[in-house]
């Protein structure tokens, strides 16, 4: 009993949800045109990242189902919907107002909720997520969930910099935004991949040089996963 309690305490300590009841505030408060404008600015500020992903998406074969984690107001399924002309797209976002915008402007499937906690019964040929892991309360659980719900491919980006020597994830809570601003540890996520059964030849972690005009982070992290069985 004592050992189980200690394990639970360590688990809570190593995530960031405990005590932060305003988690997700920055995404929940915006609505309508203001919300669309905000997501469009975010998308435009990561052009190189998105270009890399689009090229990656176009070279994947036999994709029938795709899941986007953190779809926002739907830049991909609405403005870039031609990418999914022959694919069943599903988008997930924690913001109820963002998902309302998606459903209003697209016939694709959309789900609202905390991806880490959502019960997702089906698996997808490709799961991708842009600049979401930088803000979640449990980075390992977030990435592990993506690995779990993909049949074959996953593409994950972290935009706050490339930290090859960082031994553990670094989490910084911003109370005004109701969000974390995380530094993503490549060393720690490699350990997590091994723990959940991914072989070294099934994932690739690289730095992507970007033109961050308003940020000091000139490099971003791109994780590409391809399951072999």
Residue ranges and their predicted role:
Residues 128:
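A conserved beta-strand element that flanks and buttresses the S-adenosyl-L-methionine
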Residues 1-58, 63-72, 155-183:
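Conserved class I S-adenosyl-L-methionine
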Residues 73-115:
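Class I SAM-dependent methyltransferase SAM/SAH-binding core
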Residues 141-154:
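A short glycine-rich, Lys/Arg-flanked "PGG" loop and its adjoining helix->strand segment in the class I
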Residues 131-135:
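Short catalytic micro-motifs in class I SAM-dependent methyltransferases
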Residues 179-197:
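Short alpha-helix
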